[in-house]
Amino acid sequence: LRDCAKAYSDEQLVADCDKYASPVTEVERRNGFLLHGKLGAFYARTKYYITDEEILSSISYHTTGRPGMTDLEKAVFLADYLEPFRKQPTTPELNEIRRIAFSDIDKAVYLALQNTLRYLKESGQETDMTTAETYEEYRLKYENE
């Protein structure tokens, strides 16, 4: 369900989010694929009749994360990051993050965010502000380890 809007083009995601879902940031407008979570949450509510706000938030933020995530949001975020059939190149740390996720979900989220930001920087891509804010929350917790 988290990826129910993933097949849409970037242009369609932006147009549909402008029309139906939450406001679209400039980074999201330039990187429409980021919106499949927001639009997916809208469809989960309107097409699949999901009313649980935690589930809807988990769908909405499964790509970017968000500060103050619940355990369910963390689990869905990590499930998306760790799925075995991702198109994005995997990192050498992926198996280690999978292992850590079973004992320390917060640390696994931190490492996933750290790897995501490194990948975006190295590939010259923009970082969504919500992802940056989420990383900062976890960095403050784990930077001295």
Where are these regions (language model features)?
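Charged phosphate-binding loop/patch that engages nucleotide di/tri-phosphates or the phosphate backbone
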Residues: R118-E145
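Divalent metal-dependent catalytic cores for phosphoryl transfer on phosphate-bearing substrates
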Residues: L1-L111
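C-terminal beta-signal and terminal closure region of outer-membrane beta-barrel proteins
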Residues: A112-T116
